[in-house]
Amino acid sequence: MSNPKLQTTTTDNAGVPSRDEILARAKDIAAIAAKDAARRERQRELPFDIFALIKEAKIGTLRVPEAKGGPGGSISDYIEVLMILGEADSNIPHALRSHFNFTENLALSPIELEDRRHLEHVLAGKLFAGASTEQGTKRPGEITTRLSADGERYRLNGRKWYATGTAFADFGTFSAIGDDGQPIGVLIPLDRAGITILDDWDSMGQRMTASGGVLLENVEVLPHELTTRKLGSQIGRHSSAMRQLHLAASAAGAVQGALKDGVDYVLRQARTTLHSSAETANQDPFVQKMLGEISAGAFAVKTLIREAARTLDRTAVAFATGDEEAIEAALLEGSLATARTQIIASQLSLTVATNLYELGGGSATSSDRNFDRHWRNIRTVYNHNPLAHKARVIGDYYLNGTTTHLREGRVF
């Protein structure tokens, strides 16, 4: 790992890929991942090799501004990379969610001393992940993990869940309760003694995101590794909307993957329908119609995601102006845009994944093809956030001007 004592940063971009190079490298990595995606998912084989390539390609530097030594990619660029990777395997972009949430804060915040250390790690290709959620608590968001003083240092003890991407990462952030009873965060190297990353994620979909548990047993924490998290801050609210769009983009990748699988299946094996006069499946009007509908759905989903990304780009631009009124207006529009996108994109995405089976008969259900992974992955992604609540919040806003949940900086 990079030197933890490193205290300086540089705006010299040497060794950091450009925005265009990252997009090209993402396509190369996706091509490699796609070759074995169905088998990997069927056997639940975590893609450590793919994440090694992602680190080598420095995909995780994309949102770091040029002034801070990065390629200066936009949110639209980053979302595009997610959909490129997701078309090959939607698990891959999903597992990068915590990392890009972390780098968004680096991109938009003033760089303090400790941030300089983290920035150097990001620019070196290191990945960040972690977990806040715990199982077995009375309400979501409750924390039982404890950070206790131990002389001039601290000890961290607890068990986390939904540690998405942590198995592939180099550094992790974890929430805890301090000796004073107040919430506190830590950001520590994941190879530190006492950290055990568990391979116990048992979801029906997104099975290779490494979203299971992490045991924290008497883990040493240094004073400079303490962090604070402000969900209600402006950057925190922006990041919340971006995290939700990240999930939608991962699912959009699965939709594009379903379209690709459908085309390949028709051209290579599918037969005509029983009542068709066509001799081959690619000439069958029933198959053509269904594939056209699948293509339209996939196009609509990608278009929705891209438009929401452009909305969040405008929020990032507003931050650069320092205009409080402009920032607040952009944050509100970003929350609305990502919520609207998820409501409709979820419906279209699941329809596409279901209609994939209409392209063939019983052979389309072959477990070897593993077409059902697309539906399972999409359904799992959209189970992360309460879609019905989003629709209600939007309706309340239009009818009554209520913005409470739109401004709280949480997944609403």
Residue spans for each PLM region:
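Glycine-rich flavin
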Residues: 48-56, 61-164
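A short core secondary-structure module
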Residues: 162-197
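Glycine-rich phosphate/cofactor-binding loops in nucleotide/flavin-utilizing enzymes
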Residues: 358-412
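Generic structural signal for well-ordered, non-transmembrane alpha-helical segments
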Residues: 27, 253-256, 260, 292-299, ...
